[in-house]
Amino acid sequence: GKYTCGETCFKGKCYTPGCTCSYPICKKD
């Protein structure tokens, strides 16, 4: 996809579309 994951989760959520929290880092769905 056009989005890149890898930001830190914030309260278990990722704000980048298509990403989910794999604590502590957001990973692609």
Swiss-Prot record:
There is a cross-link at residues 1-29 (Cyclopeptide (Gly-Asp)). Pfam families: Cyclotide. The keyword S-adenosyl-L-methionine does not apply. Keywords: Cytolysis, Disulfide bond, Knottin, Plant defense. This is a cyclic peptide. Signal peptide: none annotated. GO terms for biological process: defense response; killing of cells of another organism. InterPro entries: Cyclotide, Cyclotide_sf. The keyword Disulfide bond applies. Disulfide bonds join 5-19, 9-21, 14-26. The presence of a 'disulfide through disulfide knot' structurally defines this protein as a knottin. Belongs to the cyclotide family. Moebuis subfamily. Probably participates in a plant defense mechanism (Potential). Binds to and induces leakage in phospholipd membranes, particularly ones containing 1-palmitoyl-2-oleophosphatidylethanolamine (POPE). In vitro, displays cytotoxicity against cultured cells but no hemolytic activity towards fresh erythrocytes. Not active against Gram-negative bacterium E.coli ATCC 25922 or Gram-positive bacterium S.aureus ATCC 25923 up to a concentration of 64 uM. This is Cyclotide mela-1. It comes from Melicytus latifolius. The lineage of its organism: Eukaryota, Viridiplantae, Streptophyta, Embryophyta, Tracheophyta.
